[in-house]
Curated annotation (Swiss-Prot):
Occurs in many kinds of cells as a complex with monomeric actin in a 1:1 ratio. GO terms for cellular component: cell cortex; cytoskeleton. Keywords: Actin-binding, Allergen, Cytoplasm, Cytoskeleton, Disulfide bond, Phosphoprotein. It holds the Pfam family Profilin. This is Profilin-3. The modification Phosphothreonine is found at residue 113. Phosphorylated by MAP kinases. It is found in: Cytoplasm, Cytoskeleton. It comes from Corylus avellana. Binds to actin and affects the structure of the cytoskeleton. At high concentrations, profilin prevents the polymerization of actin, whereas it enhances it at low concentrations. Belongs to the profilin family. A motif (Involved in PIP2 interaction) lies at residues 83-99. Its main location: cytoplasm.
Amino acid sequence: MSWQAYVDEHLMCDIDGQGQQLAASAIVGHDGSVWAQSSSFPQLKPEEITGIMKDFDEPGHLAPTGLHLGGTKYMVIQGEAGAVIRGKKGSGGITIKKTGQALVFGIYEEPVTPGQCNMVVERLGDYLVEQGL
């Protein structure tokens, strides 16, 4: 399966049987190279990936400044140290799951809930970890 198929079929999927889906998603290498993304995923800046990777290595690094992605600032909320970063902006937010080689991004807006975004992103991330990726 291509990386784009993972994005299209597993991240941009129908979450609840009602046609709800993430606003944007991507699979990005630890070096910031985009492996695959939805058409709506923002253009990443190198310093944003550097900050995200540093927060995985040093949990709490992004808390004072916020998580920036494509120039959008998210307030960092509870995650899982070294594994998951979560952010909030208005009625939407972001979940980032770190695997051995990649970062799985999911961005949501209402009516999709934070829990639904977490489930979609972490399910694919956990699968990739199991596959050694």
